[in-house]
């Protein structure tokens, strides 16, 4: 059975069939799902999903795109929600310079990234990192915090080079692998997956985004994760069953969701 470590079932893309889709997960080989907040508006939606579905867990945090909207009250709410039994991580948090080119924007993102990492450290929770076009700054901040003592975490939708992957792996962190690994042109990620130990990989969708082949361009869901597991298996010369088993154990260990 598969654990999806990063999903967004609160997204409006699921408004028409959320209930039916989630109720089909077990028969589709999906055992557990972590619904990850990205905005303040998603906090209560994630809580509702956690409370309604026994197999849905949560991660609470603010995506870097919304860093400029964060206040002290936002951070207090993240801390409060992190105390819930099924809230298993702080995320998704990090840096995204793709649309944010100005140094002032970078400074705001870094400040809020650090503030949320502080919560993860103080509450002894793992983190889920979003990083886009911000490889060096993300790595430097994460390294600083890991040296200061952190529970661990996942680099979500890992997209950088094998060399950067090696730095995260040396820190004991996990790489989140999703649909992109099935794309023909994803040479850099395929090299990273071949290099990284299976013991430091977890499966994720980022749904409704990043659907794997053969469903690329369509709405993604956790039911597509067997395609991701198969792609990883082929790159590593092992079975998809081994990928599913080991990544499930990795997620259970990091996120504390043994049952």
Where would I find each of the regions flagged by the language model?
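Mid-domain alpha/beta scaffold segments of enzyme catalytic cores
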Residues: 1-259
